[in-house]
Amino acid sequence: MAQLVLFDKARVAAWVAQEVGQGADWGSYYAMGVERDGQMIAGVVINNFNGANATAHIAIKRFTKAIIPLFQAVCDYAFNQCKLKRLTGMVPSNEPHIIAFDKHIGFEEEFIMKDGAPGADMHVLVMWPDKCRWLRKE
């Protein structure tokens, strides 16, 4: 059975880094994930906090219903606990399936950085708290 991993940020972050090819240190970050049978199958790292914005990095190896509470926990942390005004995702244009997935979960295209990624443009995506379907409505 899949379960949330909310309090082992180093383990989740190491797995996400491997999955997304992150070679650099995350800096100040928080991470949450989903594991099944002791193996990570999904994770989100949030870093580059500046008080209003942070960057989200998402890795999913296997889809499960536990992805829903993961996104709820991530958005609750970002928007309710950290009081961020936005979450930012950056995806190279040569990864159209990732852009489509991010839009499916609620990110919107904000702009495209010409030559912002090695060999590609960089899509800058944003999730706004007032449009976030993962937040529980009061």
Regions found by a protein language model. Name each.
Residues M1-Q22:
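Short amphipathic alpha-helix that is part of the acyltransferase structural core
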Residues G21-G33, A54:
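A short helix-loop-beta-strand connector motif used in the catalytic cores of GNAT acetyltransferases and
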Residues Q39-N47:
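Conserved beta-strand in the GNAT
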Residues N50-R62:
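Conserved acetyl-CoA binding element of GNAT-fold acetyltransferases
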Residues N80-V91:
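Conserved GNAT acetyl-CoA-binding A-motif
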Residues M90, E108-H123:
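Conserved catalytic-core motifs of GNAT/GCN5-like acyltransferases
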Residues G116-E138:
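C-terminal "cap" of GNAT-fold acetyltransferases
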